[in-house]
Design a protein with these regions (language model features):
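N-terminal regions encompassing targeting/leader/pre-sequences
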Residues: 1-2, 412
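Extended, H/D-rich, highly charged conserved domains that either
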Residues: 95-385
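Short linear segments in intrinsically disordered or otherwise low-structure-confidence regions
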Residues: 2-4, 8
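Extreme N-terminus nucleophile/cap motif
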Residues: 77
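SIR2/sirtuin-family catalytic core signature
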Residues: 21-59, 65-68, 81-99, 338, ...
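Acidic/glycine-enriched edge-of-secondary-structure segments
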Residues: 366-391, 402-417
Length: 484
């Protein structure tokens, strides 16, 4: 198709679309402009994919905090095997101080072979490996009380949220409640050390495991799937009907080249849909009006959940992948020729212009309000809302959600309190029409849907709104279904 300049396209559209204007600088202008005459903020409907650590885990990446702590100790144990006799990095220390310890170390040398450490995930069945673990525990000790608490949480619960743990300690410090730290500066120093190790660990994971083959077709199809009437909140059906009307007019009046521009970002074409569209048109003609297409019939079919409505009538206008991870797994789903956007809201590995944000973000908590009154900036150093101002990521997110109604897909994000401020902004926004969680299903058939909903509820002040917007389990499914 022949596409015009951005300025001319907007003039032709005759509408104000501030978000899309901002995107022209860094999006694929060609596919955007072909769709420009259709862009009306009041009649479009977008989708935000909320991506958390469970998304990386679903792709087989060892990126949980428990994996990270395990990796940290692998590195420390490796240093001893390679000949170091004393370790102390501020988090933990270990010392081989006598001849008995030196003799014990000799029997573990076989764990090193050709410079490679044989102690890896899944090797715990080896007796000598277990003995080395016990030996390391005997000669090591914690140098950081905060790091010790993280380890004990993993030992007792088999998981930990380091950011939530940090905020708990910050509150204990503020309340002078049996806190081993005398100043937030000391606590922040330990957090910075942990953050540095975490970044190093994730870089290793990404370098070793990241590859295009990780992309799962079932997840990609879910990201790009059509809207479903059962997912839309009752309080937002008016906006959904406006979207249906605008999309109907577009697909039934524009030429094929224009429609192709829109469908290409989903990896589709008008040719693939043409026969379905033609058949569908025949089913909604009004015989009393010279076979004109009847919009009301179309809207009724969608609202009645009739299966013969072609999916192209229900595809989102824009898709934003909101990535809370530091890794690049989400980038696999921004395909060539797509106009979808990705926002690494918490920073990226190896990108100085988008630094890692690691801390806590719950301004709705009563204790936070008291901490803010202390007039002590050291307490606010790792509060996410402040760190967001280091880049334009948060501002771009606000621009997106203000531009048009949107649905939220939750993929691998626990929706815990460490991101409560941002999630509340999304979930209670006037343009949010639906929140659909994709849960984790265990091998025994159980799942974490209820736990996820409980976490989501804490991000709402208005429970009535929550019950309307969150999609019930009948219409939800696992992030990675069996066989995917």
């Amino acid at each position: 198709p022949i596409c015009v300049s951005p300025a001319v396209a907007i003039l032709l559209a005759g509408r104000t679309v501030p978000y899309y204007l901002g995107r022209l600088v860094h999006s694929r202008i060609n596919s955007y402009l072909c769709y420009a005459p259709f862009l009306n903020a009041e009649q479009t409907m977008n989708r935000i994919i909320l991506i958390g650590n469970g998304f990386d885990l679903a792709h087989g990446l060892p990126t949980s905090y428990a994996d990270f702590i395990r990796g940290y100790y692998i590195i420390q144990k490796l240093k001893l095997l390679e000949g170091e006799s004393e370790l102390n990095d501020g988090l933990c220390s270990a010392e081989i101080s006598d001849s008995e310890d030196q003799r014990a170390m000799q029997q573990f040398r076989w764990l090193l072979k050709d410079g490679m450490f044989k102690f890896t995930r899944g090797c715990g069945e080896n007796t000598l490996t277990k003995n080395y673990d016990r030996f390391f525990d005997k000669i090591s000790k914690y140098e950081s009380k905060f790091f010790e608490a993280i380890n004990k949480a993993i030992e007792t619960k088999n998981w930990v949220d380091i950011e939530s743990e940090y905020y708990s300690w910050l509150k204990k410090l503020y309340k002078r409640d049996k806190c081993e730290y005398t100043s937030p500066v000391l606590l922040d120093k330990d957090l910075e050390m942990i953050k540095a190790y975490l970044i190093t660990y994730l870089k290793i994971v990404q370098q070793k495991h990241f590859q295009p083959e990780l992309k799962k077709e079932c997840i990609y199809q879910t990201i790009c799937e059509p809207f479903h009437i059962n997912d839309i909140a009752y309080g937002n059906r008016k906006e959904f009907d406006e979207f249906l009307t605008a999309r109907f007019e577009y697909l039934t009046t524009e030429n094929e080249a224009e429609i192709d521009c829109f469908l290409q970002q989903f990896g589709q074409s008008h040719l693939s849909w043409r026969s379905d569209i033609d058949l569908y048109k025949d089913s909604i003609r009004d015989q009393n009006k010279q076979d004109a297409l009847d919009l009301s019939k179309h809207i009724k079919k969608v609202n009645d959940n009739k299966g013969d409505v072609p999916g192209c009538f229900l595809l989102p206008d824009q898709i934003l992948l909101l990535n809370f991870n530091y890794t690049s797994t989400a980038d696999l789903y921004v395909t060539k020729g797509s106009d979808f956007e990705i926002n690494h809201i918490h920073g990226e590995l190896d990108n100085d212009k988008n630094p890692i944000i690691f801390g806590y973000g719950d301004e709705l908590d009563d204790d936070y309000k008291e901490i803010a009154k202390l007039n002590d900036n050291d307490y606010l150093k790792n509060i996410k809302s402040i760190r967001y101002l280091e880049t334009d990521n948060y501002r771009r997110l606000l621009s997106f959600i203000d531009s048009a109604p949107f649905q939220i897909y939750i993929m691998g994000h626990s929706c815990g309190n460490s991101d409560r401020t941002l999630l509340n902004t999304l979930f209670e926004h006037k343009n949010c029409v639906s929140i659909k969680p994709f849960y984790y299903q265990k091998d025994d058939g159980s799942d974490n849907y209820i736990e996820l909903i409980q976490n989501i509820s804490r991000n709402f002040n208005d429970m009535r709104l929550m019950r309307d917007r969150v999609v019930n389990k009948s219409y939800c499914r696992p992030l990675v279904p069996a066989g995917c």
